[in-house]
């Protein structure tokens, strides 16, 4: 019975070590891949001393805006347009 428990413990330790190795390998692969701007939103935080170009669009200081791929989210309004890799997207700001 002790032998069976010892073998089970050794098996569990070996499986855990293998799982950690796989996890590290996956993290390395994810780190090596370049981020795809087309699949991500770009957040913009407007400070008081920033350029007045966004203020001209009605965006006030302290507002968080994002360059969205498609439509603005329900609690956002379109404040203008932005570019990601040359493509024009809506600039959405929280209300």
Curated annotation (Swiss-Prot):
<dbReference type="InterPro" id="IPR006080">
    <property type="entry name" value="Beta/alpha-defensin_C"/>
</dbReference>
<dbReference type="GO" id="GO:0050830">
    <property type="term" value="P:defense response to Gram-positive bacterium"/>
</dbReference>
<keyword id="KW-0211">Defensin</keyword>
<dbReference type="GO" id="GO:0019731">
    <property type="term" value="P:antibacterial humoral response"/>
</dbReference>
<dbReference type="GO" id="GO:0061844">
    <property type="term" value="P:antimicrobial humoral immune response mediated by antimicrobial peptide"/>
</dbReference>
<dbReference type="GO" id="GO:0005615">
    <property type="term" value="C:extracellular space"/>
</dbReference>
<dbReference type="GO" id="GO:0051607">
    <property type="term" value="P:defense response to virus"/>
</dbReference>
<feature type="signal peptide">
    <location>
        <begin position="1"/>
        <end position="19"/>
    </location>
</feature>
<protein>
    <recommendedName>
        <fullName>Defensin alpha 4</fullName>
    </recommendedName>
</protein>
<dbReference type="InterPro" id="IPR016327">
    <property type="entry name" value="Alpha-defensin"/>
</dbReference>
<dbReference type="GO" id="GO:0031640">
    <property type="term" value="P:killing of cells of another organism"/>
</dbReference>
<feature type="propeptide">
    <location>
        <begin position="20"/>
        <end position="62"/>
    </location>
</feature>
<dbReference type="GO" id="GO:0031012">
    <property type="term" value="C:extracellular matrix"/>
</dbReference>
<keyword id="KW-0044">Antibiotic</keyword>
<dbReference type="GO" id="GO:0050832">
    <property type="term" value="P:defense response to fungus"/>
</dbReference>
<dbReference type="GO" id="GO:0071222">
    <property type="term" value="P:cellular response to lipopolysaccharide"/>
</dbReference>
<dbReference type="GO" id="GO:0002227">
    <property type="term" value="P:innate immune response in mucosa"/>
</dbReference>
<comment type="function">
    <text>Host-defense peptide that has antimicrobial activity. Inhibits corticotropin (ACTH)-stimulated corticosterone production (in vitro).</text>
</comment>
<keyword id="KW-0964">Secreted</keyword>
<keyword id="KW-0929">Antimicrobial</keyword>
<dbReference type="GO" id="GO:0050829">
    <property type="term" value="P:defense response to Gram-negative bacterium"/>
</dbReference>
<dbReference type="InterPro" id="IPR002366">
    <property type="entry name" value="Alpha-defensin_N"/>
</dbReference>
<keyword id="KW-0051">Antiviral defense</keyword>
<dbReference type="GO" id="GO:0051673">
    <property type="term" value="P:disruption of plasma membrane integrity in another organism"/>
</dbReference>
<feature type="disulfide bond">
    <location>
        <begin position="72"/>
        <end position="92"/>
    </location>
</feature>
<dbReference type="InterPro" id="IPR006081">
    <property type="entry name" value="Alpha-defensin_C"/>
</dbReference>
<feature type="disulfide bond">
    <location>
        <begin position="67"/>
        <end position="82"/>
    </location>
</feature>
<keyword id="KW-1015">Disulfide bond</keyword>
<feature type="disulfide bond">
    <location>
        <begin position="65"/>
        <end position="93"/>
    </location>
</feature>
<dbReference type="Pfam" id="PF00879">
    <property type="entry name" value="Defensin_propep"/>
</dbReference>
<keyword id="KW-0732">Signal</keyword>
<comment type="similarity">
    <text>Belongs to the alpha-defensin family.</text>
</comment>
<keyword id="KW-0295">Fungicide</keyword>
<dbReference type="Pfam" id="PF00323">
    <property type="entry name" value="Defensin_1"/>
</dbReference>
């Amino acid at each position: 019975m002790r032998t069976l428990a010892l073998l089970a413990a050794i098996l569990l330790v070996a499986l855990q070590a293998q799982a950690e190795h796989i996890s590290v390998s996956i993290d390395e692969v994810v780190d090596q891949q370049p981020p795809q701007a087309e699949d991500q939103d770009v957040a913009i935080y407007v400070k008081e001393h920033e350029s007045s170009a966004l203020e001209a669009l009605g965006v006030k200081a302290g507002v968080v805006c994002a360059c969205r791929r498609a439509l603005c989210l329900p609690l956002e309004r379109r404040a203008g347009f932005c570019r990601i890799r040359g493509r024009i997207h809506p600039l959405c700001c929280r209300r």
